[in-house]
Swiss-Prot record:
EC number: 3.1.-.-
Superkingdom to which the source organism belongs: Bacteria
Entry GO MF terms: nuclease activity
Protein name (record): Putative pre-16S rRNA nuclease
Biological process terms in GO annotation: rRNA 5'-end processing
NCBIfam families noted in UniProt: PRK00109.2-2, RNAse_H_YqgF
GO CC entries: cytosol
Native organism: Helicobacter hepaticus (strain ATCC 51449 / 3B1)
HAMAP family reported for this sequence: Nuclease_YqgF
Length: 138
């Protein structure tokens, strides 16, 4: 498996990030969005600094009308990147829910803080990366 992989969970306020290092999926600090151009520039910087070859992007399945809007928004955001490597889209359905569930051992206040500071988003990106890796094995 190529070690130069970055996964992202693109949201309106934050972009969760995760990478693969020595076959271990690790969350990275999220990008806090001020606007889409600033966020795209920051993501471009991460991609260059980490010498990423594959960008894995979480994309909701096409079931509902709001998913269609989200798909368009994510596709537009990714089009702002100057990244020239491979871009793969992976179904992100329930990744945020699962990430929140994985923190159920935490007190409510700490879970809320993890949501606000983007740690939840980076845990979602970890699950997106896990789904990508599983899809490559099958």
């Amino acid at each position: 498996m190529n070690h130069c992989i970055l996964a992202c969970d693109v949201g309106l306020k934050r972009i969760g990030l995760a990478t693969l290092k020595q076959e271990i999926i690790l969350p990275l600090p999220p990008i806090i969005r001020i606007n889409r151009n600033q966020a795209a520039k920051e993501l471009d910087n991460v991609l260059k600094e980490r010498n990423i070859h594959i960008l894995v992007v979480g994309m909701p399945s096409g079931g509902e009308a709001e998913h269609s809007d989200t798909q368009k928004r994510i596709s537009h955001f990714i089009s702002l990147l100057s990244f020239e490597g491979e871009i793969c889209f992976v179904n992100e359905d329930y990744t945020s829910f699962n990430a929140l569930q994985s923190l159920s051992y935490m007190k409510r206040q700490n879970r809320a803080r993890a949501q606000k500071d983007g740690r939840i988003d980076s845990l979602s990106a970890c699950e997106i990366l896990q789904r990508y890796i599983q899809s490559q094995k099958s």
